[in-house]
Amino acid sequence: MSLVFDEYGNPFIVIRDQQAKERLRGIEAHRSHILAAKTISNIMKSSLGPKGMDKMMVSQDGEVLVTNDGATILENMQVDNQIAKLMVQLSKSQDDEIGDGTTGVVVLAGSLLEQAEQLIEKGIHPCRIYEGYETACKIATEHLKTISDSIEFSKDNIEPLIKTAMTCLGSKIVNRFHRQMSEIAVKAVISVADLERKDVNLENIKLEGKEGGKLEDTQLVKGIIIDKGISHPQMPKIIKDAKICLLTCPFEPPKPKTKNSIEITKAEDFKVLGEIEQKYFTDMVEKVKATGANLVICQWGFDDEANHLLLQNNLPAVRWVGGLDLEKIAMATGGRIVARFEDVSADKLGRAGLVREVGFGTTQDRYLSIEDCPNTNAVTIFVRGGNKMIVEEAKRSIHDALCVTRNLIRDNRVIYGGGSSEISCGLKISAMADDIASIEQYAVRAFADALDAIPLALAENSGLPSIESLSTVKAMQIKEKNPRLGIDCNHRDTNDMKAQHVFDTLPGKTQQFLLANQVVKMILKIDDIIKMGPGADE
């Protein structure tokens, strides 16, 4: 325990270090949290690149998840160590900001900490290490700008965007159809993008999936798809020139907010009550029909009596539609959501050229497709696959491609993949380290060595001799002064990533370096770990 003495010489306890707490200090603390971070990094390393392996996650209730997405893997891992949780948050930050590169940022952070551990063992203070890392990171991010290229695209020329999205999908489960999936993702983003303002709202793109069919059956719908069907089997399944009434209020008589009861003593009274309720339903249906609506979409359900009245009045309806779906339908059709039935009017109706119910094979599954909407800024990517697991992974993959395309519209600069940018930055940092006279030179060189972890992992995952491949590409970059040379993961007999059309976005790679460096700095500044134990509050 830690004791201090007051002005009278009496001792008192500041921190009780016995059974109540577990404590690590100094170099032991650094070793502990560097080991935790390296463990997470090593788990993720085999998932990096186009030949990266998938991970199977099995939850406590037996639900199986197979994925290659770094953020998803870490999100579903049961991590108890607090430093390991920082690595999970690191991947999530990359996913939230960029949408791609979630595996690479964790591998890079683990490599930086591994190099830092070697410097700490040599007696270099962690403060000097992360100061050197800051210097090296600044050199790397500036060098990325010098080796980047700008790509030109327009609504009529989306091929450069498609090729960049294909790089993102190369390691995913959809890689056999990555050309088709990239085209779908790019066309979806272009549909909702304002190219003049370089603004993209991905919330206007809905990702919907249904198991059954093949991955290549995935399609882009210029409209909204909802996982619901028409409420009655005898109602029309195809509505042309649809005028849609959107309701968030229940399609039923209002219920009093206070406690009440009705006493019925005669059969005639019960009959009158039923007639009043039926009249209320009839008035509601007539009020909707009077607006000119020929389709009702309701957030809440309605009973069979209301459903039968709707059928009699030839008014198709859809019930139990989620609030978010209702908002997207309103945005696409130009309609306004009605919260009180008294407010139903013709000017609040949404419009669509075609609304149709589509079924799947021999199953009872159905979905509603709302197409030819006035607002073309709302689209749906409808994903198909052999089972739910494939559909969900395909949706995650397409989401990454959407994010990459959005980033390119915001900033059209790209750097080349295959580890070429890391190798080029490593060479630049090593050259600049010669001009640093202080002890930080060791940390700067360590940063350059840490960058080699990315091309080494790419080569190893592709079945290539990792060290030999890295050495060869480094020598070629120095000899030819060509920063586009990287690891030939796809075995195409050329190391020129421009010729292979392997691209990364400049903002994505820059963010990787900055986030990894920030987390490493945070971890290196921790020199004392205090864990509360049982009985600590006694």
Curated annotation (Swiss-Prot):
Source organism of this protein record: Dictyostelium discoideum (Social amoeba)
Quaternary structure (record): Heterooligomeric complex of about 850 to 900 kDa that forms two stacked rings, 12 to 16 nm in diameter.
UniProt similarity note: Belongs to the TCP-1 chaperonin family.
Gene Ontology CC: chaperonin-containing T-complex
Name assigned to this protein: T-complex protein 1 subunit epsilon
One example GO MF annotation: ATP hydrolysis activity
Primary site of residence: cytoplasm
CDD domains membership: TCP1_epsilon
Compartments it resides in: Cytoplasm
Keywords for the protein's UniProt record, in alphabetical order: ATP-binding, Chaperone, Cytoplasm, Nucleotide-binding
Presence of the UniProt keyword Zinc in the record: no
Superkingdom, natural source: Eukaryota
InterPro entries found in the cross-reference section: Chap_CCT_epsi, Chaperone_TCP-1, Chaperonin_TCP-1_CS, Cpn60/GroEL/TCP-1, GroEL-like_apical_dom_sf, GROEL-like_equatorial_sf, TCP-1-like_intermed_sf, TCP-1_chaperonin
Function per UniProt: Molecular chaperone; assists the folding of proteins upon ATP hydrolysis. Known to play a role, in vitro, in the folding of actin and tubulin.
UniProt-listed GO biological process terms: protein folding
